[in-house]
């Protein structure tokens, strides 16, 4: 599995969200590259890894990334957070975990109210078969909905998406299956690495309340929460400076 490497300094692995690729992190990469060695992952079926044989499944992807990277902090955005959290819960080489607009459980459950209804993801999976492009555009609009810079962010996401090979329908449906059926809440209870959780105040896909609820499950003495005022589901597009400062401070304090 191909992983782009850039920069110099302490290692940081970045894993993107549904339908995108690692190019989405460009605003962060520009600022972090002078201070960190960045390992930019395109998930299987996405971007530069659109033909990789690695399946889009947590254990296989995490193993492939771990085999190609040194001890590092792992950052996961949205869907990418499931891979980062799984790695943090199972691999000793994960020095720290950054969950960016991501939670251990993306869909609403009886004991997990601050999340999207699973029917929304099911509908996206069905719509992909009928109209791929329209469905992707609708999801990108949800990524930016609520943000104070929604229109600008939407234009950025559309441009970024088309800069590399777009995932096929089967890959996207596999990602939706992960979002709909993965529940890693139990992994938080005994989480060993320190963690930073970043929420967009206006995020409509992963409400800030769900991220706050996740931090309660993790060890309190090793868990930090940052809420980006005015941020949506992709706060690194509109608040790159604030995000970069928070990431660097967190990484600098790791043992």
Curated annotation (Swiss-Prot):
Its main location: cytoplasm. This is Pimeloyl-[acyl-carrier protein] methyl ester esterase. Its EC number is 3.1.1.85. Belongs to the AB hydrolase superfamily. Carboxylesterase BioH family. The active site is at 78 (nucleophile), 203, 233. GO terms for cellular component: cytoplasm. It is an enzyme of class 3 (hydrolase). The physiological role of BioH is to remove the methyl group introduced by BioC when the pimeloyl moiety is complete. It allows to synthesize pimeloyl-ACP via the fatty acid synthetic pathway through the hydrolysis of the ester bonds of pimeloyl-ACP esters. InterPro entries: AB_hydrolase_1, AB_hydrolase_fold, BioH, Carboxylesterase_BioH. Keywords: Biotin biosynthesis, Cytoplasm, Hydrolase, Serine esterase. Substrate binds at residues 18, 78-79, 139-143, 233. It comes from the Bacteria. Monomer. GO terms for molecular function: pimelyl-[acyl-carrier protein] methyl ester esterase activity. One of its GO terms (biological process) is biotin biosynthetic process. Pfam families: Abhydrolase_1. It catalyses: 6-carboxyhexanoyl-[ACP] methyl ester + H2O = 6-carboxyhexanoyl-[ACP] + methanol + H(+). NCBIfam families: bioH. Pathway: Cofactor biosynthesis; biotin biosynthesis. The gene is bioH. It is found in: Cytoplasm.
């Amino acid at each position: 599995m191909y992983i782009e490497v850039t920069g110099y300094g302490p290692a940081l692995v970045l894993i993107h969200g549904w339908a995108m690729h690692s190019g989405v992190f460009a605003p962060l990469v520009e600022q972090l590259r002078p201070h960190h060695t960045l390992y930019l992952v395109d998930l299987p079926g996405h971007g530069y890894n659109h033909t990789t044989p690695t399946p889009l499944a947590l254990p296989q992807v995490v193993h492939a990334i771990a085999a190609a990277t040194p001890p590092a902090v792992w950052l996961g955005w949205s869907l990418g957070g499931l891979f980062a959290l799984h790695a943090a819960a199972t691999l000793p080489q994960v020095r720290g975990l950054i969950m960016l607009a991501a939670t251990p459980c993306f869909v609403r459950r009886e004991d997990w109210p601050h999340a999207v209804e699973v029917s929304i993801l099911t509908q996206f999976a069905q719509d992909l078969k009928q109209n791929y492009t329209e469905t992707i555009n609708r999801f990108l609009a949800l990524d930016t909905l609520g943000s104070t810079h929604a229109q600008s962010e939407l234009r950025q996401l559309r441009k970024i998406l088309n800069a590399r090979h777009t995932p096929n329908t089967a890959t996207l449906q596999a990602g939706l299956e992960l979002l709909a059926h993965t529940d890693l809440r139990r992994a938080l209870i005994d989480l060993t690495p320190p963690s930073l959780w970043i929420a967009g105040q206006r995020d409509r896909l992963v409400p800030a309340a769900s991220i706050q609820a996740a931090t309660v499950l993790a060890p309190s003495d090793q868990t930090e929460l940052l809420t980006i005022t005015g941020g949506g589901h992709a706060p690194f597009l509109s608040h790159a400076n604030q995000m970069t400062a928070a990431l660097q401070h967190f990484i600098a304090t790791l043992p």
